Amino acid sequence: MRVLRLTPFFHHDCVTAWPAEFDAVGGMQVQILRLSRELADRGVEQLVMTVGFPGLPRERVDRPGLRVRVTRAPLPRLRSELTGLVGLNQAWLAAVLTACAPLRRTWRPDLVHVHADGQLWALLAGPLVSRLVGAPYCLTLHCSRLASYEPMSRFDRLQHRLVAAAERYALRRARRVSTLTSRTADTVARLLPLDRALVDVLPDSVGDVRPVARPEAEEYVRSLGVPAGRPVVGWVGRVAHEKGWRDFVAMAERWDAGSGAPGAVFAVVGDGPQRERMREAVEAAGLADRFVFTGFLPHDAVPSVMTALDVLVMPSAHEELGGSALEAMVCGTPVAGYAVGGLRDTVGSVTPSLLVPRGDVAALTRAAGDAVTDAERHRKTVAAAVPDLLGRYGADTVERALEHYRLAVGRASGGGAGWAP
C-alpha cells in the first residue's frame, strides 16, 4: 500500500537543534513520526510532505519505505507568537499542491492521510490533494475545532466559525476519519452528523518510552542546570499559548504560600514561539533563580526528564489527548493539570484528584503540591496503572492504523464518509 502523508508537523530526529520559529517539536510531531516508522516496518510505503526548516535535506529516506520531503514555499521570516513564522502553514499547503500535481503520473498513492490540528490549511489539503492525485483521503483530527479546540487569539476567535466549517467540509468528504479519543469521535459524529462506525479511535502511542534508573535520570537533569536538593516541577513541550504557560508561571508565584510543599525548582523542557514571552514573565515575577529553561531536547531524552520530575504540570487550554501526560505516567511520575479534553481520560483514569477546573491556578498549585508532599501515595497509584496505560496506548496502535487504512482503501468509491445532509 502507498500512503501520501500530509502534515505541517513532523519530528526530525536526525538533528539536535530545532529553530523555534519553525514551530518547535511537540507531541503531535513525535506521534506522527512514530506511526510512520511503525507502518513502514509493516510494509506500508509512505511519502511524507511536511514543513521542515533550513539545514534539513530536501528529501531523505528515513528507513526503507519511508521518504520525508521538506515541502515549503519561500516566505519571509516574520515571527509569529502563534505559528512560529507568519504564513508558515500557508507556505506548506502551496508547496504541497505544487508537488502533488505530477504524483498521479509518477507516484500515485492508494490513500492520502491528512493530519489536522485545528488550523485551516491542513483541513483544505485533503479535498484538494485527493482530487489532484486521484486517490481517497483519510483525516486524523489531532485537535478538533468542533470538539475540543479553544481559539488562541482575537483573530483566531474571529475565524473560528470559518475553520469549524472547513473541518465539517473535510470530514464529510473523507473516506474515513480517526480521532485520538472516543469523546471527540462521538462529538464529531453527532454534530455533522456522521456515521459513527466510520470514525476510528487511534490514540497516541507511548512507543518505547520507559522509566530509567532514578540516579541516572537525576544526573541527566543536573547536566541541564537543574539543581539538586529541591522538588522539580516540570513543564514539557511547546511553549505556546494553548499550553497554558502563563498559568504555569502564576502557579510558581503561588508555590511557596499555596502549595504546602517545599520550595521547588521549575523546569521548562522544550521550546516554542512564546519562549521569550515566558522568560520575560518569569523575570517580571522575580522567579528567574527558580526556573531552568532547557530549550529543545531530543525526544530520546524524554524518559530521563520524566523520571526525574516530581510532578509534571499541564495547565493546557485544550488538550486532545495529552501524550506528555502518558509518557510521564509510564515513567512513574504523577501529572497535575486542568480537566480538559483527553486529560480527563488519561490522567483522570489514574489520579483524578490532580485534575482541577481550567483557570483555577490556586487549585492547580495545591494539586501539584499534593503530588510532591504525598509522593509515595501518588507514585504507587501511577505505578499500578502503568500496565493498563501500556495496554491502551501501546503496541496495538499500529494494528489499528493498518485496519483503518484497509477500510479506507477497501470502501466502495463515491460520496464522502457516509454523511447525512
Curated annotation (Swiss-Prot):
InterPro entries tied to this protein: Glyco_trans_1, Glyco_trans_4-like_N, Glycosyltransferase_grp1
GO biological process: neomycin biosynthetic process
Organism superkingdom: Bacteria
Transmembrane annotation, as ranges: none
GO MF, any single term: 2-deoxystreptamine N-acetyl-D-glucosaminyltransferase activity
Keyword terms, alphabetized: Antibiotic biosynthesis, Glycosyltransferase, Transferase
EC number: 2.4.1.283
Pathway: Antibiotic biosynthesis; neomycin biosynthesis
Reaction it catalyzes: 2-deoxystreptamine + UDP-N-acetyl-alpha-D-glucosamine = 2'-N-acetylparomamine + UDP + H(+)
Function of the molecule: Glycosyltransferase involved in the biosynthesis of neomycin by mediating conversion of 2-deoxystreptamine (2-DOS) to 2'-N-acetylparomamine using UDP-alpha-D-glucosamine as sugar donor.
Family: Belongs to the glycosyltransferase group 1 family. Glycosyltransferase 4 subfamily.
Identification of the protein by name: 2-deoxystreptamine N-acetyl-D-glucosaminyltransferase
Source organism (scientific name): Streptomyces fradiae (Streptomyces roseoflavus)
